[in-house]
């Protein structure tokens, strides 16, 4: 049990969660219980709690106690209507999140959302694939929709009536207009607009199910607002019946003005209550590229465990901008360590002599390799050193709608050939497949393109690192497949929001990352049980095996070369990245800030102990075993850019494949030669002066395998 000064409203909002408090009765007798609370989310509604004392609910009135809306940063006192008899001594009081008064409304709304989404999918099938990028869409075309869906007007009318009834139910429950579910009335307006011109319905699916402001998605957003029961408890009073309570003023950290002070306070040395400010120069300094909630949680954990065990004081600061670290280093004002950096920053800093080579510490590979994938270190390697450690990781996996694939008679694809085979069925039903290539219109990063090269045995760099590898047959095969999936098989080129497309069913399957997983877990209750994840589709090899190489790195940690406390910094880094600390940190985050704060650790052992569904953990860990990262190089930016430009030119502008790849090769090789000359690998005549090692991580892994590790 962890002692928390006050509970944040977001930390305890999911059905079934409980908060426990110890309360002490000074003598036997009848006591009244009051709460100083803040409920800032449900305008015109209540958040509900069932109250237990010593494991039991003493009387019915303590079930589903409503805490009315207070406003943001505004507190009120609420006294339970009936007193409770308590014996002298300590008692355990529990508040369980519940929403029983709204369950009927919630279930009705869930049914409506699913019916609207199912109707949207059926309409797409009727309409067919005339909505892709290459199709000439006739928005003036009208449909005799009643011939295909005779009851569509009745459906629209029934949904409108049911949604209005749900709104009125919630109004009756709260005793006032439920402004927090005002989206329900916007949903009704959308449905009524569709009913006015039924022949245009297939061309206006954005009003029904396909857009973030559609009827289905507005109603689904309301589901979350009903389901979540945010409530902050500042303190609990145990008192006599007529006792006057203190006025419910906001606490010291409430209110806008004090909120600003608290924000500024997070940058001060006083943030570190464990530090001896008189010996500030002796403290280990750490900059973190994370929001304040993450920093504060780590600060507390460090004080409780690391400093207590080692005696090393640690000062934390929120990093204003990781791009400014170079400037800080030039003035000697950089910290000893940085956490939460973009995964490629350590190598970039190493090229400027700013980072410590972690291989200088004899045990680094032993403890790191035991709990992390050493391939994650590839973008942090430079020449013969490793200058950062992977901290958090993405997981790119295949997301799929079980309900839709079943209805189409499709199975989960294992290879890209399987994906190609399913595309005609998806197209016939006006659906598509997502790849990260479609999620960023302007730039295709290594994370989006690398999987296709690596699965085919290709690479961005030549074996010696002095040229691009675009002329290699394996690399060309990967590049061609990456292009033909769009040119020949019609994958959608532009899906700016895969989550919304997946939710509506217009893109019921695709490769995406941790962010999508989190959105589905916490923001799409209507899809519970309707979706799942699988391994990324792979490329079948000559021996029948399937390669599934894909990127996974997210953030990294590093030690600065001008630090005077390298040993202390390394000791902290080793503690911070250990499975025990990572798991404890993940738990503390969710305890303090709620289940939405899922820590995407890169530690395999820690992830295995986290609260992901068991089947999902198995998929994530297996996909991680295929992690393959693009090496960072003095000229890596040009290779990333040229592959991106080539894809855009070939797929969207129709340029010939080989001619455009040849152009990318020339541009890349010219820039590689210029950068390697700048860094002293080539002389002014282009002659090699020294080798460039691009195989360090492979060599380290091979050596460990030979040693039986």
Language-model-detected regions and their locations in the chain:
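Hinge/lid segment of periplasmic solute-binding proteins
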Residues: 261-280, 343-397, 420, 448, ...
